[in-house]
Amino acid sequence: MRKLNLLLLVLNIAFTSGYAQTAAVEKKLALTLVETEPSAAGYSKERLQRIDQTIQQYVDKQWIAGATAIIVHDGKIVYYKGIGYDDIDKKTPLKRDAIFRIASQTKAITSTAVMILYEEGKFLLDDRISKYIPEFAKPKVLDKFNKADSTYTTIPAKREITIRDLLTHTSGLDYPEIGSENMAALYAKADIPSGLDAKGKTLGTEIKRLGSLPLLHQPGEKFTYGLNTDVLGYLVEVVSGMSLSEFFARRIFEPLGMKDSYFYLPSSKYNRLATLYTEDSLHHLAKAPESVNGIRLNYPNTNGTYFSGGGGLSSTMYDYAIFMQMFLNGGEYNGKRILSRSSVRMMTMNQIGDLYQGSGKFGLGFGITTERGSARSPLNEGSFDWGGYFGTTYWADPKEKIIALIMTQQVPNSHGDLTSKFKILVYQALE
């Protein structure tokens, strides 16, 4: 009997050990993107073809040169294509691994860097930013502005800007060029860069100068999309002792296996940068000049020195899908934990209350789909998203376990409704 019990014990240990190893392997596989047949991951291959057809229509009508798109369902890549052209004159196909200027999609990555340091106990989210960047001490708020000569008067701010204010775009900072008229003029006079193609400038120098300028409104009282995440990028540099580029590479890109994400591309990848287009007076595709709104088209290929946390990155849709899968996995990807589940929860929930009256809200670096927003689009409540100036969009839907991105490169683009149609097409193809 003792021998029998011993045998059963050994078998039980072996079974338990084998089960644990199998479970660990399955967990690891689930955390890594795998390309698969749509039918094996709950998608209709036939209905996915509607995406090809819709994008091709936009190409044929000369509304866009081309687009890349990817859909991930529960870690399985069910759609991953480039459609149309990179160079429409030469009929060069747009490859699915093309590198795109992702502009404001940089914000979520910078916000992640901030939360990594927050988890290390380097600061609290309600700390004053002036504790780390003294130039933001004793802020003032714009009172009156003279359009004739850009002079202005100010009033004292009721309180200082916090790190949380910056993460939620409630600090009172605005954007050059695309911001409010008065603040755009004020920033232009002070030569404050938007973050894109800040030739010859460095992040620290420009953020310190920004700190001396007035705010659009009192901190914490309104939602204003602005240079907040550029300030956060410099916070990462100050606290970590690394450049933002180095921090991204060491703490996010390398652990996740994001091999094509950079502020400035290595020369070996220059030829993969997608061609940027504009449109003519009839809203048809047109070759862009060497610069658009003062931004050189080839700025990712210039080995620059300004690392804009708000808009400086270039990347591929595959790399960004990895980044988003990490969030759907609760902060982990392929066995590498980047964030805690708690930080992921905080980043992907409404952090601004009713400060913004639209159907969407804002978390810590992401737009958030509310119940009201879900009533107006296929995305489920709790989905999180954003996009980029040059025509890129992404979202993740935790309820359906969907990640989707569509990328074009065109400014301006009067046919941005392609993004809305893509959202519909992603969900209609679910089995």
Positions of predicted regions on the chain:
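Short, conserved catalytic-motif segment at the N-terminal edge
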Residues: 29-32, 36-102, 122-124, 141-146, ...
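Short loop/turn microsegments at loop-to-beta-strand junctions
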Residues: 65-67, 78, 390-393, 402
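Short, well-ordered beta-strand elements
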Residues: 394, 401-410
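Extracellular/periplasmic catalytic domains that process cell-envelope and extracellular macromolecules
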Residues: 63, 93-94, 124, 154-161, ...
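Active-site SXXK
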Residues: 55, 75, 100-129, 133, ...
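Short, surface-exposed loop or secondary-structure junction motifs
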Residues: 140-381
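Short, conserved phosphate/pyrophosphate- and ester-handling motifs at nucleotide-, phospho-/glycolipid
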Residues: 44, 107, 316
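Bacterial Sec-dependent N-terminal signal peptides
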Residues: 1-27
